[in-house]
Design a protein with these regions (language model features):
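Metal-dependent amide/peptide-bond hydrolase catalytic core
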Residues: 6, 169, 178-355
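Predominant activation on well-ordered alpha-helical scaffold segments within soluble catalytic domains
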Residues: 16, 36, 109-112, 116, ...
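Hydrophobic residues embedded in beta-strands of well-ordered beta-sheets
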Residues: 53, 95-96, 269
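Active-site metal-coordination/substrate-binding segment of hydrolases
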Residues: 66-129
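Active-site metal-binding loops of divalent metal-dependent hydrolases
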Residues: 73, 136, 162, 188, ...
Length: 355
């Protein structure tokens, strides 16, 4: 009989340590150190590629299929509305507060404890690989994308993100566009019929009324959101251009390239996609992992948020403790019980799948 209490307590202790360490994307080397030390102290062999920590179960057998357990240890920067110290892990009323506690620290430490549980077991029907990755929040080049090609063939991946331990069997893709609206620079006192700020206002209105025809049963509509605007340097000068950032969440009825081509037809500006590779992803509703989840009464849904699933070509699900609505919010937290139950549910699901 394994000691579930030790797995749970170790997970909470590790999460507290990770919260106390600043780990913004591209600067997560110290949290990588902490995860590496956690595994080594338990006599678990691991490798490091940049700030990614990789470990294989002790009796890894290349003739068996392999399950990847992945989550990330980088965070966004704390927003200005924090009332608590984002780097001081504080427990109050069953909640563990701190930056990255919910996204995706809770899922990460729960998956690590799940991996520890299976690590020394012989005669498993599947191999397990643990990947604690960096650069997820910024879709960086040295995160999971750089590691996957170096791993053995992955047959199934579980990506740990806050999903309330419901299983995301599909997730929307993402395109971030830089829009440049050109105009004519002039003194504010003079007539100017080509003010790019006015043109940008009209363009934003057009964007707000764009509706893509194809709706997904799992992922709903394509969603377009202007998230940034930048123009001008002083009050009496009309700028020569305005820069917008457009965030587009793409359902499984369109490829990112199709969305790009459609927007070029209707937006009268320069439109530059930062990346067209982060397409929507999904797994068959008849896949064994989905059927096992349903047998164990897990709920399934389509996720509007992007994760490292977009960078994994094999079948995958997104699953983890915590609530996506708390991600990137001030005074971020996760319930202790969410982590405790998350570890139990991960283990139960993988045991059912491995029968």
């Amino acid at each position: 009989m394994f000691d579930i209490n030790k797995l749970q307590n170790d997970a909470i202790d590790l999460l507290k340590k990770l919260i106390s360490i600043k780990s913004f994307s591209f600067e997560e080397d110290k949290t990588a150190d902490e995860i590496e030390n956690f595994l080594i102290s338990r006599r678990i062999k691991c490798e490091r590629k940049a700030n990614n920590i990789i470990s294989y179960n002790k009796f890894f057998d290349k003739n068996k299929k392999t399950i990847l357990l992945n989550s990330h240890h980088d965070t966004v920067e704390p927003n200005s509305a924090y009332t608590l110290d984002p780097y001081n892990p504080t427990v109050s009323k069953g909640k563990l507060f701190g930056l990255g506690s919910n996204d995706a620290g809770g899922a990460l430490v729960s998956l690590i404890s799940t991996f520890v549980h299976f690590y020394e077991k012989e005669n498993l029907n599947y191999n397990f690989i643990l990947l604690a990755s960096g650069e997820e929040e910024r879709s960086g080049p040295n995160g999971i994308k750089s590691v996957i090609p170096t791993l053995p063939k992955i047959d199934l991946a579980i990506v740990g993100e806050p999903t309330l331990m419901d299983i995301a069997i599909a997730e929307k893709g993402l395109i971030v566009f830089d829009l440049i609206i050109k105009g004519t620079s002039s003194h504010a006192a003079h007539p100017n019929k080509n003010n790019p700020i006015y043109k940008a206002a009209k363009l934003i209105n057009i964007i707000s009324n764009i509706n893509f025809e194809k709706k997904s049963d799992l992922l709903g509509d394509v969603k377009l959101t202007v998230t940034q605007i930048n123009a001008g340097i002083q009050h009496n000068v009309v700028p020569s251009d305005v820069n917008l950032v457009l965030d587009v969440r793409v359902n499984d009825k369109y490829s990112n390239k199709e969305i790009f081509n459609e927007l070029k037809k209707v937006l009268d500006c320069q439109i530059i996609p930062r990346n067209l590779e982060l397409n929507s992803s999904s797994i068959s509703t008849d896949h064994r992992i989905v059927n096992c989840a349903k047998k164990l009464k897990f709920k399934t849904y389509g996720s509007p948020t992007l994760s490292d699933q977009a960078k994994i070509s094999c079948d995958s699900i997104k699953l983890g403790p915590g609530d996506s609505l708390r991600s990137h919010t001030a005074d971020e937290f996760i319930f202790i019980d969410e982590i405790n139950n998350g570890i139990k549910k991960y283990i139960k699901l993988l045991e059912e799948y491995s029968l």
